[in-house]
């Protein structure tokens, strides 16, 4: 496993912001740092965060939230030189399939939700990966609400197609559990009357991503096969490897 740990976020109001780089790929190269970041919702950063955000050189923000979530909470500040792309991979409202009513483990529940998103959100996922593949957009930050589910899928697909071993892809995904707990602690301290988040929001079991990747490959032959099915071109896949691997 690559020696990559979850760093402290440079932004006080973000809890799952981190560099996706640093992982070893199967061909001896390494995923470049400072090119792709993942995060929970960026609407909580403000003018006091401008210098830290600018220091990262971020050019593009990919927001995977539902339109209603963007309308409710707002978006990343409109910093100079920043391109904002709202891409919502279509998927069912999880409220219609509550974990408490599912009768399965949390890992199985989440993996099923991810599989549903991979089936219905192909266009959005392909668009997001295509944007990441274009070096002119880098550095890129991809985020959703908690930065673990929709963002976790996009980052897992990206790392996998770069040749990062499943062990590391799964470990990167599982880092979001600690981030969710930090967020929950912050909510308790700042909004004591807020409702406790449900288990699917708080946990990122490693088994979830193991199941998702295994079953995706069973259906499409490989992660690359899935991305091609979704609409990512061979040229985009080659570009992804060219600029994200050292």
PLM region descriptions:
Residues 146, 150-151:
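Ser/Thr-glycine-rich phosphate-binding loops at phosphate-binding pockets of nucleotides
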């Amino acid at each position: 496993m690559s020696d990559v740990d979850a760093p402290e976020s440079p932004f006080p109001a973000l809890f799952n912001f981190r560099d996706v780089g640093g992982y070893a790929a199967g061909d001896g190269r390494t995923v470049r740092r400072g090119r792709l970041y993942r995060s929970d919702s960026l609407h909580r950063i403000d003018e006091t965060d401008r210098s830290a955000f600018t220091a990262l050189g971020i050019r593009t923000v990919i927001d995977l939230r539902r339109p209603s979530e963007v309308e409710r909470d707002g978006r990343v500040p409109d910093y100079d030189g920043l391109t904002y792309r709202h891409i919502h991979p279509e998927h069912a409202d999880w409220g219609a399939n509550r974990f408490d009513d599912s009768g399965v483990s949390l890992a199985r529940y989440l993996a099923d939700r991810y599989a549903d998103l991979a089936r219905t959100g192909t266009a959005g996922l392909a668009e997001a990966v295509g944007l990441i593949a274009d070096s002119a957009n880098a550095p890129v930050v991809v985020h959703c609400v908690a930065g673990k589910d929709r963002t976790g899928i996009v980052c897992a697909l990206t790392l996998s197609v770069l040749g990062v071993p499943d062990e590391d892809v799964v470990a990167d995904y599982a880092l979001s559990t600690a981030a969710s707990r930090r967020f929950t602690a912050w909510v308790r301290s700042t909004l004591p009357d807020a409702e406790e988040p449900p288990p699917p929001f708080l946990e990122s079991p490693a088994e979830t991503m193991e199941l998702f990747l295994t079953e995706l490959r069973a259906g499409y032959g490989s992660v690359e096969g899935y991305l091609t099915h979704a609409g990512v071109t061979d040229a985009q896949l080659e570009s992804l490897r060219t600029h994200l691997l050292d």
